């Protein structure tokens, strides 16, 4: 069994840590408020934005799963660059088998509905993308092997924004705009799967099988919830929705043997709706 460190042990990190612990791995989690770390993860109370305390020895795998506390350049720099620098420095006397850096598919600049793979160019067109790409470069140039996973939009328990908007009658969708998503359980499953693979590439896209027109998702949810009047809008050129208009391919990660529990939004949201 392996010794695993999860830096940034929030919702996704705790889900991963608990799952790994249940499989017999020894898992440590870093969080500013260690009381929020779910047992049986071993808590480490520390701030990644400051110098870190001495870390557990003989770590095999590192997961960097940090979220910026707010949407501005300083927050993104601290979360994806400064924090990672501090972590790599704290690991200077160790030789983990791999560092996994959790990034975002938002670094892909394509916005005309194109098919996007790991070979497609990524561009730092805004501060968030620039900082994420800077963090990716740091991870891949660390003194131990690194792999970047660019997740699409994550949904699942506790991440029910679309459902809430539809139920409240506040939902509107952008016409002819594709969106890409992944259930949080598949995020965990995918990371566990990759951790067990000895030979990995440096970059994987983490999304389900089905890039989907945003309005199709909203309309399907509205039908399941017996809600009408989903407002359709034309996307503006610089809107966030328009910037996300691409069709991400998961062919590379599926080629590693991973099988999605929720291959599309229908399976994932159906289960969420049943739990309401």
Segments and roles (model prediction):
Residues 161-164, 173-195:
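Substrate-positioning beta->alpha
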Residues 41-90:
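NAD(P)H-binding glycine-rich loop region in Rossmannoid oxidoreductase-like domains
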Residues 112-148:
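Catalytic helix-loop patch of NAD(P)-dependent Rossmann-fold dehydrogenases
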Residues 190-193, 197-238:
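Mid/C-terminal beta-alpha module of Rossmann-like enzyme folds, strongest
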Residues 13-14:
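N-terminal Rossmann-fold NAD(P) dinucleotide-binding loop
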Residues 133, 142, 154-168, 193-204:
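Glycine/proline-rich active-site loop of Rossmann-fold NAD(P)-dependent oxidoreductases
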Residues 241-276:
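C-terminal amphipathic/interface module of NAD(P)-dependent oxidoreductases
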Residues 86-125:
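Conserved Rossmann-fold NAD(P)-dependent oxidoreductase catalytic core, especially the SDR/UDP-sugar
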């Amino acid at each position: 069994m392996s010794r695993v460190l999860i830096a940034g042990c929030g919702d996704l990190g705790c889900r991963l840590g608990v799952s790994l612990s249940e499989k017999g791995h020894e898992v440590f989690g870093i969080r500013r408020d260690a009381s929020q770390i779910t047992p049986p993860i071993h808590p480490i109370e520390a701030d990644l934005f400051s110098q870190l305390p001495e870390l557990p020895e003989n770590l095999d795998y590192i997961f960097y799963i940090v979220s910026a506390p707010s949407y501005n350049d300083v927050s993104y720099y601290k979360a994806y660059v400064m924090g990672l620098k501090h972590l790599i420095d704290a690991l200077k006397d160790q030789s983990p088998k791999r560092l996994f850096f959790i990034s975002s598919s938002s670094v892909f600049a394509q916005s005309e509905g194109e098919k996007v793979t790991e070979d497609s160019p990524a561009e730092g067109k805004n501060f968030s993308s620039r900082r994420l790409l800077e963090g990716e470069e740091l991870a891949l140039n660390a003194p131990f092997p690194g792999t970047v996973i660019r997740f699409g939009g994550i949904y699942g328990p506790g991440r029910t924004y679309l459902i809430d908007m539809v139920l409240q009658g506040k939902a509107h969708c952008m016409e002819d705009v594709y969106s890409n998503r992944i259930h949080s359980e598949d995020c965990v499953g995918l990371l566990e799967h990759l951790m067990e693979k000895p030979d990995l590439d440096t970059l994987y896209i983490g999304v389900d099988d089905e890039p989907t027109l945003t309005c199709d998702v909203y309309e399907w949810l509205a039908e399941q919830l017996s809600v009408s009047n989903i407002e359709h809008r034309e996307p503006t050129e610089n809107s966030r929705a328009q910037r996300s208009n691409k069709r991400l391919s998961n062919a590379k990660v599926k080629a590693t043997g991973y099988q999605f529990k929720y291959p599309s939004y229908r399976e994932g949201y159906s289960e969420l709706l049943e739990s309401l």
